[in-house]
Curated annotation (Swiss-Prot):
InterPro entries: AAA+_ATPase, ATP-dep_Clp_protease_ClpX, ATPase_AAA_core, Clp_ATPase_C, Clp_protease_ATP-bd_su_ClpX, ClpX_bact, P-loop_NTPase, Znf_CppX_C4. The gene is clpX. Component of the ClpX-ClpP complex. Forms a hexameric ring that, in the presence of ATP, binds to fourteen ClpP subunits assembled into a disk-like structure with a central cavity, resembling the structure of eukaryotic proteasomes. This is ATP-dependent Clp protease ATP-binding subunit ClpX. One of its GO terms (biological process) is proteolysis involved in protein catabolic process. Belongs to the ClpX chaperone family. It comes from Psychrobacter sp. (strain PRwf-1). Pfam families: AAA_2, ClpB_D2-small, zf-C4_ClpX.
Amino acid sequence: MAKDKTPQCSFCGKKKDEVAQLIAADDANICNECVALCTDLIEEGDLNTVDSEDGEVNTWLTKKLPTPKEIREHLDGYVIGQETAKKALSVAVYNHYKRLKVAAKLAEDKKQAKLGADDAMVELSKSNILLIGPTGSGKTLLAQTLARMLDVPFAMADATTLTEAGYVGEDVENIVQKLLQAADYDVEKAEQGIIYVDEIDKISKKGENMSITRDVSGEGVQQALLKLIEGTVAAIPPHGGRKHPNQELIQVDTSNILIIVGGAFSGLDKVIQQRTEKTGIGFNAEVKSKDDGKQLSELFKQVEPEDLIKFGLIPELIGRLPVIATLEELDEEALMQILTEPKNAIVKQYQYLFEMEDAELSFTEAGLKAIAHKAMERKTGARGLRSIVENALLDTMYELPSMSDAKQVVVDEDVINEGAAPKIA
């Protein structure tokens, strides 16, 4: 069969008739889409570059790391408030990837015989992170934003769906498999990624007097997570699926994967108060912070490892989570900021959708306040904002594409509180 000689892009493989433009050179071609992609990567300061000598991709490990201040500034663009948590995360993430750079340099020096076996080196420990904060306070968003900034693979898991190996449900190796998939099965890239495990508080031991029956999703899962955090070699089936006898498995070392775990830890405030206040005796003592988000946040800031052990986390797991960052409960003002200020703010997203229909979407100040107030009432934090806006605009988004004269859509407090239709002009 004759070889197809139709010119095609050397980068994406698209043929000349599949793109708007194809720029040809002697030995290579590039299409307009790849040019646009490269331009975007340069403008965004993408940290992946290609080595000109051997064509291998060099990650940010060979480049200058963003400083904690630069990491914090990037987080500020997407996450409102949570200043203490952002600072703690920025330092922890910076130190973690600095540790990987040191390890990579050490390995290279040994490879080139620059270091002998007896040369003393300070071994840097991994700083895994525990995030404590109410639902919808930004724990997941912080982890996702960090991974996106560093351009590393990211995988997320819900601790409540995990079981011990051998039981029905997801085991810890499934999380590593998700990370490997996010890295397009590039093992080296996956081993530099970030894993976020949410709802870690839901797998706490139910008390000091544990039942002798098998704890499928409690302490056993904590022990399995401990192996992942400490560093283990996970055997992953190629391209997903189940393990089979005589199957060649992909070996992934988790020693250098940054593990972030988070949870709301409802009831932890009582444990802390019992320790810090002499007037609070036992779990039935009145907790003043119950309806006071600010006071609850202040209590969380006083958390100690012993409180987490009493809550139900095993000591070995807590010992592997040296960085503890607490997030505050978001108030109405913060929720209003979240609606409009971040780079990917919910209001901006819907305004863009309406622009595509040649209509301008706007929210009154009272309308924004009503959205934030409703989210506060639902106790869903920032997580509940989108559903409120979606419900308010559902009928309008259904009708708008069929309307030729709609140029302006206004959402006020009546739309949110009374279910009235947005004003269309």
